A protein has these predicted regions:
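Helix-loop-helix junctions within the multi-pass membrane cores of secondary transporters/permeases
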Residues: 78-80, 87-158, 336-417
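Transmembrane helix-loop boundary segments of multi-pass membrane transporters
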Residues: 46-47, 65, 112-124, 142-157, ...
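Intrinsically disordered, low-complexity non-transmembrane regions of multi-pass membrane transporters
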Residues: 1-19, 23, 74-88, 202-213, ...
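Alpha-helical transmembrane segments and their helix-start/interface "positive-inside/aromatic belt" motifs
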Residues: 14-22, 46-52, 80-88, 148-153, ...
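Transmembrane helical segments that form the transport core of multi-pass membrane transport proteins
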Residues: 243-356
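Hydrophobic core segments of alpha-helical transmembrane domains in multi-pass membrane transport
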Residues: 24-37, 51-61, 93-100, 130-141, ...
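Juxtamembrane and boundary regions of transmembrane helices in multi-pass small-molecule transporters
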Residues: 2, 138-153, 169, 173, ...
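Transmembrane helix-loop junctions in multi-pass membrane proteins
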Residues: 32-46, 66-74, 100-115, 134-146, ...
Length: 516
């Protein structure tokens, strides 16, 4: 065990640099705003800075931990299920995994509290069932080779059809649920399952089908919540603004964070437990992994646990109040339009601090053998999230319905999926669920809510929906990246015969005569 920990130290230093590169730009933007056009109290500023430090250390531990534990666990379970060639086992285990992972997701409790007209346990069980069913569908799609765009057309048509019967006050919360339930705990494991399943297939489309699980798992919660909204006539949602902290000295600052720490210690333990138990059962029954590999996975799980606890503590206690207060200050100024470019700038950088984005970018680079680099993927995600936050701020300032953005956005994204290479489509729809993680929920959403309070808007209809917008735009930007790559490849191929002819002519002697 000591050897494993020592060997991981160089990797921790590497992950620390990555975390600093992700979080420092956000901290710099907020500090510039605080010392210029959006003054905040020392309490909020100190909480934000300590929160940023915890997020940096949290990302460092989580990214290495997920690489050492969640990814190999998911890949081995996925490979084992595929090798079994037992359809009933795949369906049963797939549903159970989706259900248990989702039911323990901390953000699902937050979503349930926002919809008082639906009993909490009813909503949680329904959403978990939705994820379980759609994870099974995702497995079957991969095994049967069903094109992802075909399924997306059917499911999103059903979503927008149901949306016509749901009270407008409930729409934004319902669409947010798709991003909320694919959190940093579930995404790495689910994506690794997909890689494990496709690795057993030997056909040429196996790599294309490595992704797409998160895409379909994001559909289940939206459908489940929309159906509940119709059944329970959920015309009301609630909003509890975050408490703005007041600390007098450094001791009170530490007490504020240490009091919240036990909550996240318990939440992450609850989230991690079903995955560990399921993997333990697979290990005893079928996997039989050697002790050294198990030790590495165990150390990785500890890193993952420490990382997520630190990350969520820093994000919820440090970032959430700062985001809300900044939104109120910026929205209360005469030049409210500044919310749009500032929101876009923050959105561009904040997605780089999403824990699961690191896992996605790394898996994309590995599965494509470097054809899609982590840097290229990150740039496409940043552009998408930047656009989505800008549009979200337009909604806050104008009160435009979220459907005016979601319907054209999804229509365009699904339309181009029929001409874009399959792999890019699957990655794009996975990226939507990955990008809308805890940083969106704890900073971007409070920023929009604070601005909405300042402009006197309806928080439930105008501010909620940021998560849904963030989940939508990467579908477009990543696929456009794929379309550009495809056009470049075609252009290069068409130019190749001309180059070959030129080379042939160059080899001929000067006095050669070619008769036509």
């Amino acid at each position: 065990m000591d050897t494993i920990i020592r060997s991981s130290l160089p990797k921790l230093r590497e992950k620390l640099l990555e975390a600093l590169q992700a979080v420092l730009p956000i901290a710099a933007i907020v500090l510039i705003l605080c010392f210029s056009i959006a003054p905040v109290s020392p309490s909020i500023l100190l909480c934000f800075l300590l929160g940023a430090a915890m997020i940096i250390v949290g990302i460092m531990f989580f990214t290495l931990g997920a690489e050492m534990s969640m990814t190999p666990m998911g890949e081995r379970v996925g490979s084992m299920l595929t090798r079994s060639q037992n359809l009933f086992l795949i369906i049963g285990v797939g549903f159970l995994l989706g259900f248990l992972i989702t039911i323990s997701e901390p953000d699902l409790q937050v979503l349930a509290n926002q919809v008082p007209s639906i009993p909490n346990m009813t909503l949680i069980l329904s959403v978990a069932t939705g994820v379980g069913i759609f994870l099974v569908m995702a497995f079957l799609r991969m095994l049967l080779g069903i094109p992802l765009p075909r399924l997306l057309v059917i499911f999103y048509a059903a979503i927008f059809l149901l949306a016509a019967f749901v009270p407008k006050e409930f729409l934004a919360v319902a669409f947010d649920s798709g991003g909320v339930t694919t959190g940093p705990m579930t995404v790495p494991f689910i994506m690794a399952l997909g890689v494990g399943v496709s690795a057993i297939r030997s056909d040429r489309h196996a790599a294309d089908d490595s992704f797409g699980l998160v895409a379909l798992c994001s559909v289940g919660p939206i459908l489940a919540v929309l159906i509940l909204g119709i059944v329970f006539n959920a015309s009301e949602s609630s909003y509890l603004p975050p408490v703005i902290p007041e600390v007098g000295d450094s001791v009170e600052l530490w007490q504020l964070f240490s009091e919240g720490l036990p909550t996240y210690l318990h939440e992450i333990a609850t989230s991690l437990l079903p995955i560990v138990v399921m993997f333990g059962i697979f290990q005893l029954v079928a996997l039989h992994i050697d002790r050294r590999t198990l030790g590495r996975i165990g150390v990785g799980l500890v890193y993952t646990y420490i990382g997520l606890v630190l990350f969520l503590t820093g994000a919820n206690i440090g970032f959430m109040p700062a985001g809300n207060y900044l939104g109120q200050v910026l929205g209360g100024q005469s030049s409210r339009w500044l919310l749009i470019p500032i929101g876009m700038l923050i959105g561009y950088f904040i997605v780089r601090a999403e824990p699961a984005v690191y896992v996605l970018n790394k898996q994309v680079e590995e599965v494509t053998d470097g054809a899609i680099s982590a840097g290229t993927m990150g740039a496409a995600l940043s552009a998408g999230v930047s656009l989505s936050v800008g549009l979200a701020m337009v909604r806050v300032l104008t009160g435009i319905s979220i459907l005016w953005f979601l319907i054209p956005g999804y229509l365009f994204a699904i339309s181009i999926s029929f001409v874009v290479p399959k792999l890019y489509t699957a990655i794009a729809f996975d990226a939507g669920g990955v990008a809308s993680g805890p940083m969106t929920a704890t900073f971007l959403l409070p920023l929009a809510q604070g601005a909405c309070i300042a402009v006197g808007g309806n928080i439930v209809t105008d501010a909620f929906g940021v998560v849904a917008m963030v989940a939508m735009t990467p579908l477009i930007t990543v696929q456009l990246m794929g379309l550009v790559a495809q056009l470049k490849t075609r252009k290069a191929r068409s130019a190749q015969p001309l180059l070959d002819t030129a080379a042939l002519l160059a080899d001929l002697p000067d006095d050669a005569i070619i008769e036509l």
